[in-house]
């Protein structure tokens, strides 16, 4: 090969091996800019989480406070938890849940202790990738789940058991639920871990302080008689080691005021507990007897505040002479 031909061959080889100019790169050479959520890289949509049970929803609000995590309420606020399964199983409730599930990454449930909680199975119909966070018991088993009372364990697990004898009325159980949710949400949204853990610490501190103060005051009481107006506050009485007096509400509402007066005179409870405010006639009978009425609502917007307020109110009532 003569010298000009050899130089031409070297020039051709160099041209083939040289990197392409920046302006020559076509669309096929550009990496994907789409995330799993369909948003441009660096602009991913915030974590979206579905919840329905009022205590789970209210607790989750406290945990995600100050973060971009979005909570989707799957059932109307005024709908009791006992009616949520039927609402979500069909019609408007199911349609809205499926629509929300398509854009969500996780659901918060109580399925391990409340088998009628079908929020996750229903949401999974619309989104096979959605994750379940069971607030009562972590699936991985790395964190402790909530403790159930002996009476709850004796009965078959079902909707009535856990919704009547509510384990989250024990401050230790409510703190565990918060821990489970915060841990799982931190793993799903790592950039929010610091704020989520700070919110968890604040919740735990509020519950611990209330429990400590309530225990201190209860220790000073010589006896702890309490009248449970409804069975849904049994767990609170058990957690505080109160002494429920013998009592059974009459079948007819119009007989309640007289029955209350009789029970108060016979047993002299230092407080009356209920999960809802009684009607006017019953409230007047309680007020006339001079016994504090303490209401722990199971649909309070902030279940942490509701529980701490109830614990301290009970302790103050028991400690009074």
Regions found by a protein language model. Name each.
Residues 2-3, 22-25:
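Short, intrinsically disordered or compositionally biased N-terminal tails of bacterial proteins
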Residues 8-18:
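Bacterial N-terminal signal peptides
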Residues 24-321:
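Extracytoplasmic metal-acquisition and chelation regions
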Residues 2-6, 10, 128:
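Twin-arginine (Tat) signal peptide motif
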């Amino acid at each position: 090969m003569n010298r000009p031909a050899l130089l031409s061959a070297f020039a051709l080889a160099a041209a083939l091996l040289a990197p392409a100019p920046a302006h020559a790169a076509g669309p096929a050479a550009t990496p994907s800019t789409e995330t799993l959520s369909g948003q441009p890289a660096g602009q991913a949509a915030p974590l979206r989480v579905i919840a329905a049970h009022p205590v789970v929803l209210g607790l989750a609000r406290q945990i995600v406070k100050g973060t971009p995590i979005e909570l989707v309420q799957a059932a109307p606020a005024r709908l009791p938890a006992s009616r949520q399964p039927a609402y979500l199983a069909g019609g408007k409730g199911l349609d809205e849940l499926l629509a929300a599930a398509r854009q969500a990454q996780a659901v918060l449930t109580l399925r391990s202790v409340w088998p009628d909680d079908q929020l996750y199975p229903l949401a999974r119909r619309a989104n096979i990738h959605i994750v379940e966070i069971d607030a009562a018991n972590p699936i991985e088993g790395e964190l402790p789940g909530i403790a159930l009372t002996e009476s709850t364990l004796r009965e078959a697990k079902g909707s009535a058991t856990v919704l009547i004898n509510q384990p989250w009325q024990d401050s230790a159980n409510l703190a565990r639920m918060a821990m489970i949710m915060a841990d799982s949400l931190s793993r799903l949204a790592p950039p929010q871990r610091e704020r989520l853990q700070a919110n968890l610490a604040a919740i735990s501190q509020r519950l611990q302080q209330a429990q400590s103060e309530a225990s201190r005051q209860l220790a000073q009481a010589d006896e702890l008689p309490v009248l449970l107006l409804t069975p849904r506050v049994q767990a609170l009485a058990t957690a505080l080691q109160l002494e429920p007096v013998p009592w059974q509400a009459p079948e007819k509402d119009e007989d309640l005021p007289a029955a209350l007066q009789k029970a108060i005179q016979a047993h002299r409870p230092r407080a009356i507990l209920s999960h809802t405010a009684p009607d006017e006639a019953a409230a007047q009978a309680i007020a006339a007897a001079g016994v504090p009425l303490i209401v722990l609502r199971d649909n309070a917007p902030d279940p942490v505040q509701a529980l701490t307020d109830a614990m301290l109110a009970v302790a103050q009532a028991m400690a009074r002479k």
